[in-house]
Amino acid sequence: MCSPTTENNNNNNDHLVQSSDPNHPANLIPALCAKFWTLGWVTGTGGGASIRSDDLVYLAPSGVQKELMKPDDIYVLSLAAQAQSLDKRQRVYLRSPANYKPSQCTPLFLAAFTKRNAGCCIHTHSHWAVLVTLILETQGAGKDREFMINNIEQIKGFGKGFGKSGNLGYHDTLKIPVIENTAHEEDLTEFLEEAMDKYPDTYAVLVRRHGVYVWGENVHKAKTMCESLDYLFQLAVEMKQLGLPWVTDIEPTVPTRK
């Protein structure tokens, strides 16, 4: 694993994570992760979140108990400086915390920011997400590469795709690609980017036996889509237990107006 470089070691740019604004990324990330911990999404230091503010990217560190995270624990890097780096695997951090290591999720978060112009990316270890990938695994090769569900109201919580206006409708089919897990998280990057290319309209990628990455134009959209996905994953697991299909052919109901 590549070690990070940090600019301006004299003062470590601590001002980048100091703000009284509750909506500042350095304050939002700990608040979000504390909430996600109560949902079981970031148990045992797993998972994480990152927020982009123009050129600056704020990242939760590795190994931190997410419910106890503080603004001082946040890493900050510059997308422009990262783009100019000769070694793309080498991180150029503007600000680094004293007691933690950079998250191996970092290159995956950066993929969401650079390939989808996302403003926020969330990674959870939701057990519902993991269960869905295990259920898909039983479908056999060729049928385990995407999660699909339709005719469920919560699908309306997802946008139609990158650069498109509006949200999916009740009868639309939501498709989430599944990639295989790797021993080291950063090695997922290439597979995540391939899934983004193959599914240009997706806002999420499932990682088999691991969890899910979800991104959005801003924190609000990333968070609400992550919540909607977790709802759908739980619903899908329970539907499977009842023998109910995830994809159905239902004729639209049209009201009769007099």
Curated annotation (Swiss-Prot):
Zn(2+) binds at residues 123, 125, 210. One of its GO terms (cellular component) is cytoplasm. One of its GO terms (molecular function) is methylthioribulose 1-phosphate dehydratase activity. It catalyses: 5-(methylsulfanyl)-D-ribulose 1-phosphate = 5-methylsulfanyl-2,3-dioxopentyl phosphate + H2O. It comes from the Eukaryota. Binds 1 zinc ion per subunit. It is found in: Cytoplasm. SUPFAM superfamilies: AraD/HMP-PK domain-like (SSF53639). Its cofactor is Zn(2+). Keywords: Amino-acid biosynthesis, Cytoplasm, Lyase, Metal-binding, Methionine biosynthesis, Zinc. It is an enzyme of class 4 (lyase). Catalyzes the dehydration of methylthioribulose-1-phosphate (MTRu-1-P) into 2,3-diketo-5-methylthiopentyl-1-phosphate (DK-MTP-1-P). This is Methylthioribulose-1-phosphate dehydratase. The lineage of its organism: Eukaryota, Fungi, Dikarya, Ascomycota, Pezizomycotina.
